[in-house]
């Protein structure tokens, strides 16, 4: 297969040429080009006057030798207007029912049918066969048709009970278009005087018939790796579990896979990647509500599973659990402990400081920071005599928060393990320890786990970088993946830097 960087660069330049003079239609042009290069159909949904027909006309110039046919359907349209008139000569002389197809759909490579759902059953049934089999029955013969791209357009969706489901299912790519939104683009649109009949494509970029035929064979050899299949299957399972999800036929999944193969091929790759799978957002929806649903499910898929983001976070959680267990064990050893001295009249134990405490002023570190008096507190400064008096007699005790300012009232307690602790206003407690006892490096077993996570994350980022660029996927979707990987990196870093 000739999957090279040169091919990817050529297709990118071809797309940019086709996009010239069309504003806020970059994604639409690129997907229509992908459909044309892989022999698929596109449905454009949107109000009148938003360049739907111009997009279809522009795609003709992607090929060196391509005929185009376009037609605006009405409820009065006849098959003769789409597939060609009957040959009176053949009917009169030979009694044959034959159409004159020159200049009509059966001899066109690029086809644009506007207001598609207004066509009658005779047109739609013939069109269905043409899309399915790329064949057209003309009298007693059945001819192969050269159609590479069918662009169907409408300002409405097909009626649910109108018998149009089979044809709608053949429209693999579905795009929802709107008017130009950005001020600068709207200005450029108004002052642009170029004709939609002008060819913006340099001859060297246009596709020959031989190249097109060869590429159809090459696309079939693009691999679906196990990770790609698992992602697609996971998406299918997610959608099957949702009541509001659209029905997606096996045929549509199969055709969508070939589109992903084509995306990989024309981006210079020999296998489908998670980035290509983003294209399913334009293949699986049925109406506005399911468009939103599909996009949401795909976003979850690519930001949680495409590059092992959720798996990495789960393993990080496991490492953090090990770390917390280790720190709890260390807390038992490091905590500032007091000694039982006995009880007063059998009612209550009293405590005293260990004899090893010699300093007159104690700096005690909170093993977990708390908010005290509207300040995040990491350590306390308490006078030894004040603490000893509190242990003996109870009452009020005061200390400096983080060792600065005036002394503040403290809510100290001795827990059931004889550890000195402090509580905040919500009664959340944190055990206190002496600074010199608290500095304790993590064991190699845990630090190695963090390093392993960092290595796995770097590998996933390398793969993500390797899978780019992808001409047919909007940059904002790639940014979602990058943001999710960055979030994983930040969580790992935060865990490593925790005291």
From Swiss-Prot:
Entry-linked CDD domains: AAA
GO cellular component: cytoplasm
Transmembrane segment boundaries: none
Any one GO molecular function term: ATP hydrolysis activity
Ways its activity is controlled: ATPase activity is stimulated by ViaA.
SMART domains cross-referenced by the UniProt entry: AAA
Localisation per UniProt entry: Cytoplasm
Binding-site residues for ADP, renumbered to this chain: 23, 49-54, 196
Reaction equations catalysed: ATP + H2O = ADP + phosphate + H(+)
Similarity comment: family membership: Belongs to the RavA family.
Self-association and partners: Homohexamer. Interacts with ViaA.
Protein name per its UniProtKB record: Regulatory ATPase RavA
Native organism: Pectobacterium atrosepticum (strain SCRI 1043 / ATCC BAA-672)
